Curated annotation (Swiss-Prot):
Full protein name: Glycogen synthase kinase 1
Primary residence: cytoplasm
Domain (Protein kinase): residue spans on this chain: 35-318
Effect of loss of the gene: Leads to significant delay in mycelial growth, complete loss of conidiation and inability to penetrate the host surface by mycelia-formed appressorium-like structures, consequently resulting in loss of pathogenicity.
Name of encoding gene: GSK1
This protein's record includes keyword Cell inner membrane: no
Enzyme class: transferase
Keyword Transferase on entry: yes
Amino acid sequence: MSQNRPAAFNTLRMGEVIREKVQDGITGETRDLQYTQCKIVGNGSFGVVFQTKLSPSNEDAAIKRVLQDKRFKNRELQIMRIVRHPNIVQLKAFYYSNGERKDEVYLNLVQEFVPETVYRASRFFNKMKTTMPILEVKLYIYQLFRALAYIHSQGICHRDIKPQNLLLDPTTGILKLCDFGSAKILVENEPNVSYICSRYYRAPELIFGATNYTTKIDVWSTGCVMAELMLGQPLFPGESGIDQLVEIIKVLGTPTREQIRTMNPNYMEHKFPQIKPHPFNRVLRKADNNAIDLIARLLEYTPTERLGAIDAMVHPFFDDLRNPSTKLPDSRHQTGQVRDLPPLFDFNRHELSIAPQLNHQLVPPHVRPTLAAQGLDIDHFTPMRKEDMLARLD
């Protein structure tokens, strides 16, 4: 175990190299890792995130350092070692180090570094007194759904979808989901805590204290993020759960007894103020019919009525992305180059097995020859068994 204390990060001299024995993020094999130039780029209740340069490759990396409770396996590490996807931040390696106090042990997750977040991108457009271009909203929300379709098919729920956890490479337009600190494999009939997910993005069943929720809580959060990018501000702000519920009711109207039953039956006899719904086309005045239709299908009170992530991907709102002639303008710089869209359809066998009946909608015709050349012919495709797709922890 490394003797480097957390403070070592703060006292690094220019050019000084730290050497660690680490375990590979995929294989678990022990190897040497060297890095230099650390600066704090994020901190919170979980710990600290540092930006570093790996040596000798000079490649940027992020090290997330969290206090490790020795009594438990770290769920974030277990899940990060299982997930491998182009829209999920990659775990390169991990190692343990001692803290300031005698008993303290820190887990260090060495991850790829991605320079921007959807939150910061949204703030940029706010400062410019405008909203994010709709093509960018489509691009980012589609990639988020692609990441969610993958983890949900494994039985994993992220439980903290918000703009701050969506990393962005502004030069390529690639989005990567990060921070699996709240993620969990949901098992049917096993209770889960309801006090997860950040305010503004919490599904109503969580506000109602449900403990038997599903991966559809991530779908609700994604609907909130999508609406926020189009509005330039959170759709359901509120300092408390009650505040948020009031904001949701102001838009969706009062839930029916049946809808309340699907969220948490304990509240069925509760009397709520009777409020009529406020149509989404009045809330999102600039949005077209496809955007309104998608948001309405994501922000449903009844969890089973919400679209699944894979179903959302084939929604007509994303048709522009499937058009081979669509280009991505540089919305940050007046003189910027128009670019190709990043890879959005480089599906693997696992992804094509999630809902094989949708593959002809999911894979645009111009991409099919490329996939077929890799042995993934969607006309003659044998999907993986659902049970083989589920994640298993050691």
